[in-house]
């Protein structure tokens, strides 16, 4: 999608939001305010005294008309002009409204059965919360709770886990046996509820089958039941095609408030489209956005159906595909944040020195031969310290045992200690004047001892410096500073000189 398309889509969504917010007061009057007050006479002897829909004239007439139209099977080509002019259209709208009344009637019958059967099995209400499942279970069990065990019919109604819980609870319940009259009333109510449920499914099947030729494109988008509801409340397919999308979204909106309860949880501006399956399949935070989109597409589909175009539903399939494509786009995860690598450091050009002094300094500070041997390892040879018997780093070739001969360390002229020329002359002068002695060391061997073993006396204490003292005393006569001149007789003159 290009940038221009994205901007146009944003403008379209903004326009739809403005249309939703700019709802006239006249439109708000169409929102029906309903107070649900389910008043059931618990003292009624028969269920027919409180549930009168199945015996009503309207109920029987609609079912007869439905059976007649199912047998005829009129074709879409027979419908000419506005759809509202077709006699079957009114039957479809009335049948769709009848399903709502059937739902309310089923709730009344469920409450009647629950109150009557609580005398026999009061815990069953909490174990089976679904109304129809509860009614079927009550009809199957009756007055004998032992039917919970190994009952094939009950396995078609409840799950195995629920059956096990019901059977365990039934064995410990404190309920009382029902009389034959009470049991007969309960079974009558169960039969009525199951018949109403069958009639509701017949109506659903008929509406779905006939909506495919009255409004095929609209029913493809939101389903046949929802399409029939919004057509009925709008006053026909022609009126629906003339309504803007923001008003189509409000069709069927009710302010449902239970008497005595708060109305803060009521969802405003939510109609039949908001509660349709295509919208409710999305996460809750996308429901309103999806309802706006679906209502806009329903308006387009209704305009196509009002002119009897695309009877095969091609436009409806295209619009639904576009809706699903947008739904997928909304639910896509955000793009993965790209991790940018660190930029190369801006190191300036380094100054590289050269010359004789620099080369000598590198030779002096470079690796010694011993360090090179310690860093060197042989391939496929086990080191002597492989078992970590000694702490420290490996010695490499330096730690290998050789022939046993001591090799004199080679002196590297580049790495030996440097002394100045002045210090060299001073040391040389001392070695000449003092016979190589200094205040730290002399030329005598460091291994000389004052104890000696002789064959004559055995252990003998010897002074290693005695020889030096003897030489010094002998030389003191001639080289002493206190010595005097000696008298020497000259052979020629025979005189003595001093």
From Swiss-Prot:
<comment type="function">
    <text>Involved in pre-mRNA splicing as component of the spliceosome. Required for the assembly of the U4/U5/U6 tri-snRNP complex, one of the building blocks of the spliceosome.</text>
</comment>
<dbReference type="GO" id="GO:0005690">
    <property type="term" value="C:U4atac snRNP"/>
</dbReference>
<dbReference type="InterPro" id="IPR012976">
    <property type="entry name" value="NOSIC"/>
</dbReference>
<feature type="site" description="Interaction with U4 snRNA and U4atac snRNA">
    <location>
        <position position="292"/>
    </location>
</feature>
<dbReference type="GO" id="GO:0071005">
    <property type="term" value="C:U2-type precatalytic spliceosome"/>
</dbReference>
<dbReference type="GO" id="GO:0030622">
    <property type="term" value="F:U4atac snRNA binding"/>
</dbReference>
<keyword id="KW-0539">Nucleus</keyword>
<feature type="coiled-coil region">
    <location>
        <begin position="84"/>
        <end position="119"/>
    </location>
</feature>
<dbReference type="Pfam" id="PF09785">
    <property type="entry name" value="Prp31_C"/>
</dbReference>
<dbReference type="GO" id="GO:0000244">
    <property type="term" value="P:spliceosomal tri-snRNP complex assembly"/>
</dbReference>
<feature type="region of interest" description="Disordered">
    <location>
        <begin position="333"/>
        <end position="356"/>
    </location>
</feature>
<dbReference type="GO" id="GO:0000398">
    <property type="term" value="P:mRNA splicing, via spliceosome"/>
</dbReference>
<comment type="subunit">
    <text>Identified in the spliceosome B complex. Component of the U4/U6-U5 tri-snRNP complex. Component of some MLL1/MLL complex.</text>
</comment>
<comment type="similarity">
    <text>Belongs to the PRP31 family.</text>
</comment>
<dbReference type="InterPro" id="IPR042239">
    <property type="entry name" value="Nop_C"/>
</dbReference>
<feature type="domain" description="Nop">
    <location>
        <begin position="214"/>
        <end position="332"/>
    </location>
</feature>
<dbReference type="InterPro" id="IPR002687">
    <property type="entry name" value="Nop_dom"/>
</dbReference>
<dbReference type="GO" id="GO:0015030">
    <property type="term" value="C:Cajal body"/>
</dbReference>
<feature type="site" description="Interaction with U4 snRNA">
    <location>
        <position position="246"/>
    </location>
</feature>
<dbReference type="InterPro" id="IPR036070">
    <property type="entry name" value="Nop_dom_sf"/>
</dbReference>
<feature type="site" description="Interaction with U4atac snRNA">
    <location>
        <position position="288"/>
    </location>
</feature>
<dbReference type="GO" id="GO:0005634">
    <property type="term" value="C:nucleus"/>
</dbReference>
<feature type="short sequence motif" description="Nuclear localization signal (NLS)">
    <location>
        <begin position="350"/>
        <end position="363"/>
    </location>
</feature>
<keyword id="KW-0687">Ribonucleoprotein</keyword>
<feature type="site" description="Interaction with U4 snRNA and U4atac snRNA">
    <location>
        <position position="269"/>
    </location>
</feature>
<feature type="site" description="Interaction with U4 snRNA and U4atac snRNA">
    <location>
        <position position="297"/>
    </location>
</feature>
<dbReference type="Pfam" id="PF01798">
    <property type="entry name" value="Nop"/>
</dbReference>
<protein>
    <recommendedName>
        <fullName>U4/U6 small nuclear ribonucleoprotein Prp31</fullName>
    </recommendedName>
</protein>
<feature type="coiled-coil region">
    <location>
        <begin position="180"/>
        <end position="214"/>
    </location>
</feature>
<dbReference type="GO" id="GO:0046540">
    <property type="term" value="C:U4/U6 x U5 tri-snRNP complex"/>
</dbReference>
<keyword id="KW-0747">Spliceosome</keyword>
<dbReference type="GO" id="GO:0016607">
    <property type="term" value="C:nuclear speck"/>
</dbReference>
<dbReference type="InterPro" id="IPR027105">
    <property type="entry name" value="Prp31"/>
</dbReference>
<keyword id="KW-0694">RNA-binding</keyword>
<keyword id="KW-0175">Coiled coil</keyword>
<dbReference type="InterPro" id="IPR019175">
    <property type="entry name" value="Prp31_C"/>
</dbReference>
<keyword id="KW-0508">mRNA splicing</keyword>
<keyword id="KW-0507">mRNA processing</keyword>
<dbReference type="GO" id="GO:0071339">
    <property type="term" value="C:MLL1 complex"/>
</dbReference>
């Amino acid at each position: 999608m290009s940038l221009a398309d994205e901007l146009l889509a944003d403008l379209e969504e903004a326009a739809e939001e403005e249309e939703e917010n700019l709802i006239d007061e006249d439109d708000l009057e169409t929102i029906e305010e309903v107070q649900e007050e389910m008043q059931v006479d618990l003292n009624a002897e028969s269920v027919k005294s409180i549930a009168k829909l199945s015996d009503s004239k309207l109920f029987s007439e609609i079912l007869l008309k439905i059976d007649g139209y199912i047998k005829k099977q009129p074709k879409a080509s027979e419908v000419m002009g506005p759809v509202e002019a077709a006699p079957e259209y009114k039957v479809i709208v009335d049948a769709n409204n009848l399903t709502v009344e059937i739902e309310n009637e089923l709730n009344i019958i469920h409450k009647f059965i629950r109150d009557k059967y609580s005398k026999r099995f009061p815990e069953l209400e909490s174990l089976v919360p679904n109304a129809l499942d509860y009614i079927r279970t009550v009809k199957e069990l009756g007055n004998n709770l032992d039917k919970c065990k190994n009952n094939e019919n009950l396995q078609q109604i409840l799950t195995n886990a629920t059956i096990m819980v019901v059977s365990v609870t039934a064995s410990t319940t404190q309920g009382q046996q029902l009389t034959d009259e009470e049991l007969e009333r309960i079974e009558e109510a169960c039969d009525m509820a199951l018949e109403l449920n069958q009639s509701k499914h017949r109506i659903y099947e008929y509406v779905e089958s006939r909506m495919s030729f009255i409004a095929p494109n609209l029913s493809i988008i939101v389903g046949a039941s929802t399409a029939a509801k919004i057509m009925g409340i709008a006053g026909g397919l022609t009126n629906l095609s003339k309504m803007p999308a923001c008003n189509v979204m409000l069709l069927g909106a009710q302010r449902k408030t239970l008497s005595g309860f708060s109305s803060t949880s009521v969802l405003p501006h939510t109609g039949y489209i908001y509660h349709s399956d295509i919208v409710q399949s999305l996460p809750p935070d996308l429901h309103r956005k999806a309802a706006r989109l679906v209502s806009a597409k329903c308006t387009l589909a209704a305009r196509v159906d009002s002119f009897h175009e695309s009877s095969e539903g091609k436009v409806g399939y295209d619009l639904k595909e576009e809706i699903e494509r947008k739904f997928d786009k909304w639910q896509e995860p955000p793009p993965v944040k790209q991790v940018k690598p660190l930029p190369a450091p801006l190191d300036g050009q380094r100054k590289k020195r050269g010359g004789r002094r620099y080369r000598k300094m590198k030779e002096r500070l470079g690796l010694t031969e011993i360090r090179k041997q310690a860093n060197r390892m042989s391939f496929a040879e086990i080191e002597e310290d492989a078992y970590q018997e000694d702490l420290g780093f490996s010695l490499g070739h330096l730690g290998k045992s050789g022939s046993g001969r001591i090799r004199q360390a080679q002196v590297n002229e580049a790495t030996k200690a440097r002394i100045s020329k002045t210090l060299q002359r001073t040391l040389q002068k001392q070695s000449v004047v003092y016979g190589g002695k200094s205040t730290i060391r002399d030329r005598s061997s460091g291994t000389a001892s004052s104890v000696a073993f002789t064959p004559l006396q055995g252990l003998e204490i010897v002074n290693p410096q005695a020889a030096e003292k003897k030489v010094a005393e002998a030389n003191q006569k001639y080289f002493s500073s206190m010595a005097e001149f000696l008298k020497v007789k000259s052979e020629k003159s025979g005189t003595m000189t001093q």
